[in-house]
Amino acid sequence: MRRSHEKEMMDFPDNPKQVLDEDLRNLRTLNRYLGGYRSVMRGLDRLVGAGKLSRFSLLDVGTGSGDIPARITNWAQHRGIKASIVALEPEPVTARVAAILTQKQTNPLFIPLLQRGKEGDFRRCGISVVRGDGNAPPFRAASFDFVLASQLLHHFSEEKIVALLRTWSRLARRAIIISDLVRHPIAYYGIRLVTKLFTRNVMTLTDAPLSVQRAFTMAEWCELFRRAEIGPFQVFSVFPYRVLALVSPKR
């Protein structure tokens, strides 16, 4: 199966809000049942455990609806670990969804506080949802222990991915966590079947299989990390058809 370069519907601006909201809900469902959460948490658990960390900071680039930062926050709270998370999202409508979702899914005892700063920040009980671009994140070098990109890199060309990894390597003190899809015919036909069974949302039905077509094989993912030349990396296969990569930036 050759890689597709066709853009997903989500990559275009001005999608109808109702269609986008439903698609984001569907993505949360797919993350829950098809390994999106499991992949990220496996990587984070490995890194936090290896460092015996009692606290950490994390930047989630292209956070979408913020469900993964919310899951990380709850995971950390249950282990007595203090997590400080910035969820970066360029789209204003999606950033608002993330702000609301993270407030609902984390500690309900916190009083909601909405702050709009220069970058359009939305702060919610340990998670700051910030409007910003992953190409030029508005943060200083070495601002975070970890930089996370979940199901984001497959949206870009190989050259762009290498450039993004180099940009993020300057922000991460400890590691970059990449969780994404693996291109495979079984994954493609499988997600087509699964999405047709539970939704009629045109964005989900279009983008879910296209995401698999736009993804890379395991060998191609490894080659991208080598090309970036930002430091040693470990790559793991996560069921079903996901890649988890932990990259340690050179200093």
Where do the model's predicted regions map?
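Class I SAM-dependent methyltransferase SAM/SAH-binding core
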Residues: 59, 65-105, 126-136
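Conserved beta-strand signature within the Rossmann-like core of class I S-adenosyl-L-methionine
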Residues: 172-181
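C-terminal alpha-helical "lid/dimerization" subdomain adjacent to the S-adenosyl-L-methionine
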Residues: 181-226, 234
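A conserved beta-strand element that flanks and buttresses the S-adenosyl-L-methionine
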Residues: 148
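Class I SAM-dependent methyltransferase Rossmann-like catalytic core
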Residues: 17-42, 47
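A short, conserved alpha-helix within the catalytic core of class I
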Residues: 156-167
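Glycine-biased, low-complexity coil/linker segments
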Residues: 116-120
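Core SAM-dependent methyltransferase catalytic element
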Residues: 235-251
